[in-house]
Amino acid sequence: MSSATQSARFSPSPISVEHLGTIGYVDAWDRQRELAAERAENVGTDTLLLLEHPAVYTAGRRTEPEDRPTDGTPVIDVDRGGKITWHGPGQLVGYPIVKLAEPVDVVRYVRRLEQALITVCTDLGIVCGRVDGRSGVWLPASFDNGQWLPERKVAAIGVRVQRGVALHGFSLNCNSVLTGFDAIIPCGIRDAGVTSLSRELGRDVTVEEVTPAVTAAVVAALDGELPVTEHDIERVTFDSAAAGTTSSAPTFTTVQYG
């Protein structure tokens, strides 16, 4: 059996799912740590927390001072990987508190989460995938109706593994108001943007609509029932100089990674 079809979890028991509704970040963080302490001692069950947060910025361990809000908005410093991000209404947040199979492979675990979210977005009709060297789920850059759209992230992932147990997780922008990202450098990436399911599909896509599909996909991915496949997006760049001097149309350079 290949690693792509093996469970990423130590326990064969089913994952428990808790729907917490809208909950403050610190309260949800406390719940994460409570569950993680139990799982580290082989007590309780692996649990997927699904929720929304009131608007809040959280900064991972690699956040640089220049990544932080330009308007002085407070930030909660957390112990996950990655840099700064925004959470808020209209964004589905998932925290799988899971004791990982041994030997612990954090990269493989992150790829499982990405696979689950790529599957959900693809089933909705969105062309998306991974970007080499960047976690999360991305849409390729494109030139649409005269407007250049850079690569943009629809789902972010940031995790921590402590005593063999994964904490933190993912966020999927459903019908979020994306202006919350304007005051920061999301995930510390300056040459890309953020987007939402609603923006890409041209209709209102709610947290309630996608929650069942996300739940099923995350559970299947972690249990090895949803194999990890290659989903690297096509990298497209816009050569503005060439567009302005040699042609009325933009020039694209495409590179396939993977």
From Swiss-Prot:
InterPro entries: aa-tRNA-synth_II/BPL/LPL (IPR045864), BPL_LPL_catalytic (IPR004143), Octanoyltransferase (IPR000544), Octanoyltransferase_CS (IPR020605)
GO cellular component: cytoplasm
GO BP annotation list: protein modification process
Entry's Gene Ontology molecular function annotations: lipoyl(octanoyl) transferase activity
Cystines in this chain: none
Binding site for substrate: 80-87, 156-158, 169-171
Annotated site residue numbers, Lowers pKa of active site Cys: 153
TM stretches of this protein: none
Origin: domain of life: Bacteria
Top enzyme category: transferase
NCBIfam families: lipB, PRK14345.1
Miscellaneous section: In the reaction, the free carboxyl group of octanoic acid is attached via an amide linkage to the epsilon-amino group of a specific lysine residue of lipoyl domains of lipoate-dependent enzymes.
Family: Belongs to the LipB family.
Name under which the protein is recorded: Octanoyltransferase
Native organism: Rhodococcus jostii (strain RHA1)
Gene: lipB
